[in-house]
C-alpha cells in the first residue's frame, strides 16, 4: 500500500487506463498527480474529480506529449511515475508527425523529467501487445523477448499500424536511454484491454473489442486471434509491479486468449439481441489461438481475478449506461407492439 505522503504521477490520467489506475492508486493510499492536456475541460476531467479521495489526494496538472518539458513540474517530487499517455489516432492523415514522433519523443521526455526530478525511484510504462506480435506470420506463443516487425507494419499499413510502430520504437528507445542513464524502468505489455470504465467517451480498445457488436469490420483482423486482459487486472498489475522490489524488464499482462469465433460464440449467447455475425470475410473458420504468456508476471506473484465474460459484460454494461451503444429491444416485444399498434418502435 502507498503511504499518504508518497506522491506518484499518472500521465494520460483522463483516459481509459489512466483514469481507472488513478482510482485504484487513490484506494491504495497514494497521493496522485494526474496529468491531462486541459485541466479546465470539465467534460474530460469530471470523472477524475468525482473519484473518492480526489478532493484531498488528487491534483490535476497540464501536460502534453507534444510539448517538451511539460511533464517536469508534475513529476518533480514524485517517487513514482506511471506513463500511460499515448496518441491513439488510428485514422491520422500524418501518422509520422501526429502519432509516431510524439510517442517516441514524449516517452523520452518523461524519462528525462524523472532524471531531473532526482526523487523518482521507478518509472512504469504502459506499452502494448502491438510491440510484440505484429509480423507476417503469427507464432503460437509470444513472450517478453519478442518484438513486432516495424518494417512489416509500415509496408502493409493494417488498421492501427502507426500505433504499433509508435509503441515499438518508443519502447526500444526508452530501454536504451534507461540503461544508459541507470533509470529503474519497467514496461507492462497489455493485450486488448476490456472492461467497465470511467471516461465518458468510447475507449479505442473497446471499438476493437466490441467490433462484432458494433460491426466495425476493419477491426475484425485485430481480434482474429485475440488476447485479452480486464482493465482492473491491468491497473492492479501496474501497482503490484511498482511496489515489488524485484520487478524488472518487460511484463506481458494477458489473462485470456480467444479466436474471433470463440469470442462471438460467447457474445451471441450473452447478447442474442445484437444479432452478431458468425462469418467474417477473409477469416478462416478454423483458427489456432495465439497465446501471450504472462508466466513472468504470474511468477512474481501477481494473480488475475477476472474471466473473459467478466470483461465483456462489464464493457457492454458500461457502454449501455453511458449511451455509447444502443440497447436493442427484443424481437418478440417489437412484434407485440407492432401488432397492438401501441407504439412505433425502431430496433437499435
From Swiss-Prot:
It catalyses: a (2R,3S,4S)-leucoanthocyanidin + NADP(+) = a (2R,3R)-dihydroflavonol + NADPH + H(+); (2S)-flavan-4-ol + NADP(+) = (2S)-flavanone + NADPH + H(+). GO terms for molecular function: dihydrokaempferol 4-reductase activity; flavanone 4-reductase activity. Changing residue 347 to A: In strain: cv. M9. Optimum pH is 5.75 with dihydroquercetin as substrate. The keyword NADP applies. InterPro entries: Epimerase_deHydtase, NAD(P)-bd_dom_sf, NAD(P)_dehydrat-like. Keywords: Flavonoid biosynthesis, NADP, Oxidoreductase. It comes from the Eukaryota. NADP(+) binds at residues 44, 163. Its EC number is 1.1.1.219, 1.1.1.234. GO terms for biological process: anthocyanin-containing compound biosynthetic process. Belongs to the NAD(P)-dependent epimerase/dehydratase family. Dihydroflavonol-4-reductase subfamily. Bifunctional enzyme involved in flavonoid metabolism. May use dihydroquercetin, dihydrokaempferol, eriodictyol, garbanzol (5-deoxydihydrokaempferol), dihydrofisetin (5-deoxydihydroquercetin), naringenin to a low extent (10%), but not 5-deoxynaringenin or butin (5-deoxyeriodictyol) as substrate. This is Bifunctional dihydroflavonol 4-reductase/flavanone 4-reductase. It comes from Malus domestica.
Amino acid at each position: 500500500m502507498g503511504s499518504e505522503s508518497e506522491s506518484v504521477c499518472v500521465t494520460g490520467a483522463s483516459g481509459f487506463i489512466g483514469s481507472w489506475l488513478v482510482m485504484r492508486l487513490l484506494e491504495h493510499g497514494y497521493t496522485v498527480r494526474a496529468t491531462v492536456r486541459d485541466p479546465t475541460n470539465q467534460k474530460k476531467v469530471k470523472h477524475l474529480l468525482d473519484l473518492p479521495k480526489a478532493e484531498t489526494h488528487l491534483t490535476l496538472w497540464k501536460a502534453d506529449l507534444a510539448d517538451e518539458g511539460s511533464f517536469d513540474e508534475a513529476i518533480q517530487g514524485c517517487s513514482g511515475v506511471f506513463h500511460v499517455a499515448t496518441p491513439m489516432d488510428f485514422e491520422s492523415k500524418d501518422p509520422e508527425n501526429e502519432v509516431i514522433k510524439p510517442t517516441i519523443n514524449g516517452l523520452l521526455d518523461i524519462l528525462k523529467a524523472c532524471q531531473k526530478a532526482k526523487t523518482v525511484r521507478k518509472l512504469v510504462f504502459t506499452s502494448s501487445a502491438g510491440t510484440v506480435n505484429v509480423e507476417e506470420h503469427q507464432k503460437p506463443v509470444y513472450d517478453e523477448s519478442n518484438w513486432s516487425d516495424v518494417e512489416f507494419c509500415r509496408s502493409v499499413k493494417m488498421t492501427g499500424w502507426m500505433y504499433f510502430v509508435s509503441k515499438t520504437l518508443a519502447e526500444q528507445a526508452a530501454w536504451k536511454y534507461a540503461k544508459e542513464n541507470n533509470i529503474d524502468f519497467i514496461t507492462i505489455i497489455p493485450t486488448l484491454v476490456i472492461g467497465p470504465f470511467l471516461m465518458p467517451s468510447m475507449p479505442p480498445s473497446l471499438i476493437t473489442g466490441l467490433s462484432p457488436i458494433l460491426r466495425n469490420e476493419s477491426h475484425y483482423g485485430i481480434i482474429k486471434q485475440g488476447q485479452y486482459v480486464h482493465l482492473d487486472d491491468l491497473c492492479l498489475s501496474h501497482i503490484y509491479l511498482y511496489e515489488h522490489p524485484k520487478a524488472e524488464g518487460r511484463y506481458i499482462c494477458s489473462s485470456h486468449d480467444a479466436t474471433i469465433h470463440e469470442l462471438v460464440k460467447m457474445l451471441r449467447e450473452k447478447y442474442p439481441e445484437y444479432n452478431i455475425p458468425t462469418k467474417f470475410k477473409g477469416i478462416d473458420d478454423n483458427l489456432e489461438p495465439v497465446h501471450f504468456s504472462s508466466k513472468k508476471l504470474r511468477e512474481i506473484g501477481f494473480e488475475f481475478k477476472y474471466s473473459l465474460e467478466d470483461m465483456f459484460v462489464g464493457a457492454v454494461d458500461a457502454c449501455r449506461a453511458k449511451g455509447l451503444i444502443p440497447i436493442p429491444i427484443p424481437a418478440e416485444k417489437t412484434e407485440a407492439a407492432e401488432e397492438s399498434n401501441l407504439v412505433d418502435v425502431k430496433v437499435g
